[in-house]
């Protein structure tokens, strides 16, 4: 790159370093921050690198925020996405298109139903789309001037980007906003983060810059003094030289000149030279977030504005481009504003409040122009907070709401308290739970209105639920209900929240009472969405109590579009419906619905909902036997929940991931995850999460042939669930593992009553998964008591139930038990075929520990299987292949991997003495195996 700009003199090495850094392909995402003192040349290097990368066909999204824009929500993010071509936007789902349009203020926020997560996800989607064609550079000049909402979005975006070719280049002033640097480092990881610290320029570079910028050559003694006074800072050196007369240059060797030192003194001296008109223009521009010539003319007498604009442009204070009037350097704007008196600024902001169009900027000018608390100003700020929230600018909404509280007159207590509660809600939404808690705990003791107090207590209960302690959250809900009076909506919201907490704490009867009270209030409200939600909440609790599935509810409430505003994902009607399908063994329907809901959540950028849906999808996939997908979805749900910072919920996502890893036989990983979940669950006293994570540890021990250790972990869980009346057999799926552990320990007398109760409930409810597991456990009990024939019949009955429901792992467990029994009956061929089929399934889905059990049993049979005939799996594969199916088609038909089909074909050819697919087809025809295929 040819560096010829005056501003880049002496900085060629830094520019080359930057460009080399961005040519690296890993790691991604990459973030580089140019750090240095004000005026040291950060922006010049940034501009050069940005221009060069654009020339190298990078997609560049850039913004140059100023300090005056820092109060405007999404101002920087709007600059980043402004100018995107229509094709980029058309690739987004409609909700995300509306989110981008909202950032650009092209749509009414009341019509867009946006969340901050939706805004963030839309931006990520844009970046990902652009990165598919060429690398993307997110370029920000003056990181410290980012508005909070844009900063929130950018950090969130970088967290979501993994392997995409995306990089970030930003500038930041030394000794300021180090927190932002640390947050960037934590987001992209140390390996993808670098800081370029700018050093002072040399004497020669400073001299050449002054010569080329001001067309003067400083005598060497004066150049040395200017260099020392500026500290090698080019901006400061130019400003010092600008203040010296040419006569001073000529006489510099004859007398000592007063050289101004320090930025404030230098800039002050330069601004002192402006006329009154130019000073007024500069002040108006410094107070505006985005100064324009029209606004300056509106704020000042026309003649003053005209003269002043000409002068400030000639003197290099402002750069006028069309209607835009931008300061030549951000330091000039700060200096102009800082020199003005408080009264002067107050009057100016009051005047500007009547001129600007943006609602948020207007209200901030009103606030800055107020002499004392003013209800008109406070009400405007509160309304602006609502508008910002509707745009998804939740951080900006929190800031505006805080300002509204500050500007509310002290005698208007109810208004002040109302706004404090709103502020807490916005802070909680933005992820600042500590700030929300402090605000609520400070406000609640002063609340005289019972309705406000109940609302505040309900919000505090949500804070406790997500971050602290579930029993305490329940107590806060009860306190909120006690004071709710005749406010049905507060009661309804609190009852629904309390229902979920109590069911999670395994107070099922209490949960049912709360759910039924909520349903009654929902009917009284006439709100159809709330009625649907409340009916499904009650149906869920009744299901957990072992009362089965309310078929009327399930047939009437299938609509996937019934979403309730401001409700958490776990009680949204479509999600509740899908979870009930999962728990009641409607696996195919549940999976399809969960996948649709997941896509919808992503389209709207609702990652909290997406994580909850993935948690259930991962659990379901483990039950089905799609273990690799289960791990992928469990891991992703854990990642999102971690970033959301909701501590107690994290224990559930950890469980789902751990469960999948345990079934894959990854002992160390699954144990670590389950113990992590247990630690969180015990801290928050999240009883259900304790049960789930402990159950994973018990399953690991059972998989390792350590039944005594499994029993030690699982037995207390069974007692706990029985005591809580959470007796739905398909809900926790723990009891069959405990029964197997007891039988393996020789404790048949303890296993028998548990099994009888389990079988009775399974039969009563018609729960297929429980009927299959119960039949297997019955067979294990009969085998342990010395009745192998009975055991074999039970195992075959279990397989009949398995055939009604896709549960590859559980079916393979039953085949393993049947194979062991057949071996004990000395039915060698049948035992080998059954064990081989079980092994094939475990190998195909990845159940490593249980596959080892099969291999051990096959090893005990001894001999070779080559003359024992085909296993059932081999027969099905041979039949399909002889019928002309390809290996891939056969694999899809039997839900096997192509590799498994290939290995089975090798064994089939060896057993039958064949060498080709044609010979296999002929063999089937000759031996009339086609009839057997149809029968099977």
Sequence positions of predicted segments:
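Tandem amphipathic alpha-helical repeat scaffolds
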Residues: 335, 383-389, 418-430, 454-470, ...
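Short secondary-structure boundary elements
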Residues: 35, 40, 201, 205-213, ...
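N-terminal pre-P-loop "Q-motif" helix
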Residues: 7-21, 873
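Helix-turn-helix DNA-binding segment
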Residues: 793, 817, 859, 863-906, ...
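Extended alpha-helical scaffolding segments used for macromolecular assembly and cargo binding
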Residues: 31, 45-49, 135, 146, ...
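Sensor-1/coupling segment of RecA-like P-loop NTPase cores
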Residues: 153-187, 192-196
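Amphipathic alpha-helical segments of tetratricopeptide repeats
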Residues: 402-406, 441-445, 478-483, 516-526, ...
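Conserved phosphate-binding/catalytic loops and adjacent sensor/switch elements of nucleotide-binding enzymes
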Residues: 40, 45-136, 145, 175
């Amino acid at each position: 790159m040819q560096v010829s700009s005056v501003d880049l003199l002496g900085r060629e090495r830094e520019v080359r370093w930057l460009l080399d850094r961005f040519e690296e392909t890993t790691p991604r995402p990459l973030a580089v921050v140019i750090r240095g003192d004000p005026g040291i040349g950060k922006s010049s290097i940034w501009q050069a690198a940005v221009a060069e990368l654009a020339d190298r066909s990078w997609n560049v999204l850039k913004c140059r925020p100023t300090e005056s824009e820092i109060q405007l929500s999404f101002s920087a993010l709007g600059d980043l996405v402004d100018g995107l071509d229509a094709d980029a936007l058309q690739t987004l789902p409609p909700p995300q298109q509306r989110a981008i349009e909202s950032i650009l203020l092209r749509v009414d926020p009341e019509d867009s139903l946006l969340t901050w997560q939706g805004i963030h996800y839309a931006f990520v989607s844009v970046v990902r789309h652009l990165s598919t064609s060429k690398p993307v550079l997110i370029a920000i000049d003056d990181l410290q001037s980012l508005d909070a909402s844009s900063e929130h979005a950018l950090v969130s975006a970088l967290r979501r980007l993994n392997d995409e070719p995306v990089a970030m280049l930003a500038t930041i002033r030394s000794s300021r906003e180090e927190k932002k640097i640390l947050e960037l480092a934590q987001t992209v990881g140390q390996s993808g983060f670098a800081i370029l610290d700018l050093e002072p320029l040399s004497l020669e570079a400073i001299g050449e810059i002054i010569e080329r910028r001001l067309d003067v050559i400083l005598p060497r003694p004066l150049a040395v003094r200017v260099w020392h006074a500026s500290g090698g800072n080019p901006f400061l050196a130019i400003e010092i030289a600008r203040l010296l007369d040419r006569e001073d240059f000529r006489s510099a060797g004859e007398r000592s000149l007063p050289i101004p030192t320090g930025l404030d003194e230098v800039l002050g001296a330069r601004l002192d030279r402006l006329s009154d008109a130019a000073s007024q223009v500069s002040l108006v521009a410094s107070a505006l977030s985005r100064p324009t010539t029209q606004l300056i003319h509106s704020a000042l007498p026309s003649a003053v504005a005209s003269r002043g604009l000409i002068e400030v442009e000639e003197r290099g204070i402002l750069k006028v481009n069309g209607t835009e009037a931008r300061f030549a350097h951000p330091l000039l704007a700060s200096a102009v504003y800082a020199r003005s008196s408080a009264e002067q600024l107050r009057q100016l902001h009051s005047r500007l409040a009547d001129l600007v169009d943006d609602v948020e900027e207007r209200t901030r000018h009103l606030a800055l122009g107020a002499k004392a608390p003013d209800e008109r100003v406070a009400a405007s700020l509160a309304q602006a907070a609502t508008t910002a929230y509707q745009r998804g600018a939740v951080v900006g909404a929190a800031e505006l709401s805080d300002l509204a509280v500050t500007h509310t007159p002290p005698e208007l207590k109810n208004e002040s308290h109302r706004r404090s509660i709103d502020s807490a809600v916005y802070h909680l939404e933005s992820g600042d739970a500590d700030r929300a808690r402090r605000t609520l705990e400070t406000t609640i003791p002063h609340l005289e209105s019972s309705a406000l107090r109940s609302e505040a207590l309900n919000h505090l209960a949500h804070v406790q639920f997500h971050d602290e302690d579930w029993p305490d959250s329940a107590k806060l809900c009860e306190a909120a209900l006690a004071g709710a009076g005749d406010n049905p909506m507060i009661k309804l919201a609190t009852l629904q929240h309390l229902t979920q907490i109590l069911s999670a704490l395994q107070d099922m009867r209490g949960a049912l009472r709360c759910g039924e009270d909520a349903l009654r209030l929902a009917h009284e409200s006439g709100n159809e969405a709330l009625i649907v939600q409340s009916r499904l909440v009650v149906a869920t609790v009744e299901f957990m109590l072992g009362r089965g599935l309310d078929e009327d509810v399930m047939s009437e409430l299938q609509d996937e579009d019934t979403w309730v505003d401001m409700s958490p994902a776990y009680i949204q009607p479509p999600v509740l419906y899908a979870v009930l399908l999962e728990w009641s063994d409607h696996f195919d329907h549940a999976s399809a619905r969960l996948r649709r809901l997941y896509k919808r959540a992503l389209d709207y950028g609702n990652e909290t909902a997406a994580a909850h849906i993935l948690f259930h999808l991962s659990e379901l996939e483990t039950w089905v036997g799609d273990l690799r997908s289960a791990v992928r979805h469990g891991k992703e749900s854990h990642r999102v929940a971690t970033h959301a910072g909701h501590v107690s919920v994290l224990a559930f996502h950890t469980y789902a991931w751990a469960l999948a890893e345990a079934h894959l036989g990854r002992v160390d990983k699954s144990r670590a995850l389950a113990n992590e979940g247990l630690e969180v669950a015990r801290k928050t006293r999240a009883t259900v999460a304790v049960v789930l994570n402990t159950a994973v540890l018990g399953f690991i021990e059972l998989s390792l042939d350590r039944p005594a250790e499994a029993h030690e972990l699982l037995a207390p869980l069974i007692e706990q669930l029985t005591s809580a009346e959470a007796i739905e057999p398909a809900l926790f799926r723990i009891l069959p593992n405990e029964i197997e552990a007891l039988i393996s320990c020789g404790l048949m007398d303890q296993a028998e009553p548990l099994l009888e109760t389990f079988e009775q409930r399974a039969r009563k409810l018609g729960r297929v998964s429980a009927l299959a597991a119960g039949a297997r456990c019955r067979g294990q009990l009969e085998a342990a008591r010395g009745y192998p024939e009975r055991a074999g019949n039970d195992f075959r009955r279990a397989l009949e139930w398995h055939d009604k429901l896709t549960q590859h792992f559980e079916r393979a467990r039953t085949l393993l038990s049947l194979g062991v029994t057949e071996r004990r009956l000395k039915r060698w061929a049948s035992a080998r075929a059954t064990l081989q089929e079980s092994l094939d399934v475990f190998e195909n889905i990845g159940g490593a520990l249980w596959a080892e059990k099969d291999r051990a049993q096959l090893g005990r049979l001894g001999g070779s299987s080559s003359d024992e005939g085909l296993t059932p799996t081999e027969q099905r594969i041979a039949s399909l292949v002889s019928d002309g199916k390809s290996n891939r088609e056969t694999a899809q038909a039997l839900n096997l991997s192509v590799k498994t089909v290939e290995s089975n074909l090798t064994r089939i050819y060896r057993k039958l003495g064949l060498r080709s697919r044609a010979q296999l087809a002929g063999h089937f025809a000759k031996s009339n195996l086609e009839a057997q295929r149809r029968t099977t």
